[in-house]
């Protein structure tokens, strides 16, 4: 009784014709095979790219490693190694090849000309030395070294001249070490270093003992001493003035002090130069209020330190690891992908039991070098490294060390030598600055509490201040003034 009679269903083929599928696959197997091949090729390409980048990074690391001889005469002491022995051994096969490649690299035409001239000057210098004309010989040795600073023969002969004629065994040992770094099989440099290494190590240890004695003498002065308080205040200004000056800041000491005391701008100076000084002030206050009392220094502490250093100059990059590759003169720091691992290793070393056994000056200088070598930030690496160094020294009872901006070229030269394998000249440079800073404090708290020589910047100011001073020790005063004004000279 239905209103519509049931109709028979049409054949399946007819349904397909009437309602064709939107996308009908004729044969799914070739499409799957094509996708599989495409994924395989893409994966292989990605793996090859990763391997190439890793190999490039490995080459960088290998070229930064110190030589790994087993002989005592070529090694610096274990605490001076940037990488662990395990890391060095893991890379040794590749490292030996990279060293042989670099040693066998051909010289450019200009380098060949310089080497030829250097060797000629070297022969003339040796002849003059044998003839007893030491002054002329010294000048020719220096000329040869300037022309070919990494030629083993030049380093060896100049080192012998310094050792036997100038009685400068420390510098001679440094040149023997450099000669062996470039040419490990040099038998003459080897014999010379066997003779000098232990003597130089003994001299370095005696120097550190002397620094400890001066530190103890300074520690014996009560905190309530008025001269000590004034010395600390002026040293604070000096530290900031010289640290930003090393990086190119053109503020004078008087302008630096004015900014810190009044927070007023100085006419004719850029905003960045003002902000660099204010950032250092923030970082120093953070150290005094927090870091000096901490047992361990962490990555977070270093980032907080850097955040304050760049807080006014570049607040976005402050306290952040860099995200790009940077180049620092001839030094190529690690890529951004390696920073997290390298900083973790640095943190472990910084707080290790082994590091706690190092002399504070060695420890602080090494920490400075290791951090600036990693170069974890876009900007502010030098300032942050110097602040970390002084944090470690202050925890050991030393005052913050002042590296005069006039010695900027020496400072960078010794960092370059450390990159080439010998960190001892840099450690000695920091020890020298430490001693001069200690001498300044001891001098300021002895017979002239009313005047701190670090304040003086110009010859006219120096003459005016000297006229006001009544102490009989004029030679000592002049020596201190010379160091802090010219960046050279030795304190008595």
UniProtKB/Swiss-Prot annotation:
The chain crosses the membrane at residues 33-55. The side chain of Glu-247 determines which of the two opposing activities (AMPylase or de-AMPylase) will take place. In response to endoplasmic reticulum stress, mediates de-AMPylase activity. Adenylyltransferase activity is inhibited by the inhibitory helix present at the N-terminus: Glu-247 binds ATP and competes with ATP-binding at Arg-386, thereby preventing adenylyltransferase activity. In unstressed cells, disengagement of Glu-247 promotes adenylyltransferase activity. The record marks 247 as: Important for autoinhibition of adenylyltransferase activity. It is a single-pass membrane protein. InterPro entries: Fido, Fido-like_dom_sf, Fido_containing, TPR-like_helical_dom_sf. Residues 297-432 form the Fido domain. Protein that can both mediate the addition of adenosine 5'-monophosphate (AMP) to specific residues of target proteins (AMPylation), and the removal of the same modification from target proteins (de-AMPylation), depending on the context. The side chain of Glu-247 determines which of the two opposing activities (AMPylase or de-AMPylase) will take place. Acts as a key regulator of the unfolded protein response (UPR) by mediating AMPylation or de-AMPylation of Hsc70-3/BiP. It catalyses: L-tyrosyl-[protein] + ATP = O-(5'-adenylyl)-L-tyrosyl-[protein] + diphosphate; L-threonyl-[protein] + ATP = 3-O-(5'-adenylyl)-L-threonyl-[protein] + diphosphate; 3-O-(5'-adenylyl)-L-threonyl-[protein] + H2O = L-threonyl-[protein] + AMP + H(+). The keyword Transmembrane applies. Its EC number is 2.7.7.108, 3.1.4.-. The active site is at residue 375. Homodimer; homodimerization may regulate adenylyltransferase and phosphodiesterase activities. Disulfide bonds: none annotated. This is Protein adenylyltransferase Fic. Residues 1-18 have a biased composition (Low complexity). TPR repeats lie at residues 118-151, 152-186. Disruption phenotype: No visible phenotype. Flies are viable. Its main location: membrane. The lineage of its organism: Eukaryota, Metazoa, Ecdysozoa, Arthropoda, Hexapoda. The fido domain mediates the adenylyltransferase activity. Residues 1-26 are annotated as: Disordered. A motif (Inhibitory (S/T)XXXE(G/N) motif) lies at residues 243-248. ATP binds at residues 247, 328-331, 379-386, 411-412, 419.
């Amino acid at each position: 009784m239905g209103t519509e009679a049931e109709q028979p269903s049409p054949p399946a083929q007819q349904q397909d014709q009437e309602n064709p599928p939107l996308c009908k696959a004729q044969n799914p197997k070739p499409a799957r095979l094509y996708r599989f091949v495409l994924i395989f090729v893409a994966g292989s390409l990605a793996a090859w790219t990763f391997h190439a980048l890793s190999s490039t990074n490995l080459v960088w690391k290998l070229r930064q490693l110190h030589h790994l001889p087993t002989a005592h005469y070529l090694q610096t002491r274990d605490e001076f190694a940037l990488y662990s022995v395990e890391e060095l051994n893991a890379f040794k096969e590749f490292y030996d090849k990279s060293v042989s490649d670099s040693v066998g690299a051909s010289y450019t035409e200009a380098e060949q000309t310089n080497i030829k001239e250097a060797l000629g000057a070297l022969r003339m210098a040796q002849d003059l030395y044998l003839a007893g004309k030491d002054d002329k010989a010294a000048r020719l040795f220096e000329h040869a070294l300037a022309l070919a600073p990494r030629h083993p023969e030049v380093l060896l002969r100049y080192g012998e001249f310094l050792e036997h004629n100038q009685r400068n065994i420390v510098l001679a040992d440094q040149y023997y070490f450099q000669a062996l770094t470039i040419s490990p099989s040099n038998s003459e440099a080897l014999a010379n270093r066997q003779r000098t290494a232990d003597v130089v190590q003994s001299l370095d240890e005696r120097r550190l003992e002397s620094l400890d004695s001066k530190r103890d003498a300074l520690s014996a002065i009560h905190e309530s001493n008025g001269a000590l308080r004034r010395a600390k205040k002026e040293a604070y200004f000096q530290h900031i003035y010289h640290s930003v000056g090393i990086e190119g800041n053109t503020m004078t000491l008087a302008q630096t002090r004015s900014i810190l005391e009044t927070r007023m701008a100085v006419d004719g100076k850029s905003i960045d130069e003002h902000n660099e000084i204010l950032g250092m002030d923030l970082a120093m206050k953070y150290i005094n209020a927090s870091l000096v009392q901490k047992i361990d220094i962490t990555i977070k502490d270093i980032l907080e330190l850097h955040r304050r250093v760049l807080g006014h100059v570049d607040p976005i990059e402050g306290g952040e690891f860099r995200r790009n590759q940077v180049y620092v003169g001839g030094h190529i720091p690690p890529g951004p992908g390696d920073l997290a691992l390298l900083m973790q290793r640095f943190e472990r070393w910084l707080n290790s039991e082994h590091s706690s056994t190092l002399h504070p000056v060695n420890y602080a200088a090494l920490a400075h070098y290791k951090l600036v070598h990693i170069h974890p930030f876009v900007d502010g690496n030098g300032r942050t490294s110097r602040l970390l160094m002084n944090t470690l020294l202050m925890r050991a009872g030393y005052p913050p060390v002042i590296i005069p901006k006039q010695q900027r070229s020496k400072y960078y030269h010794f960092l370059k030598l450390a990159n080439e394998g010998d960190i001892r000249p840099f450690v000695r440079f920091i020890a020298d600055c430490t001693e001069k800073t200690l001498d300044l404090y001891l001098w300021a708290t002895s017979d002239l509490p009313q005047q701190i020589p670090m304040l003086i910047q110009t010859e006219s100011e120096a003459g005016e201040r000297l006229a006001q001073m009544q102490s009989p020790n004029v030679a000592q005063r002049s020596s201190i003034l010379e160091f802090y004004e010219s960046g050279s000279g030795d304190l008595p």
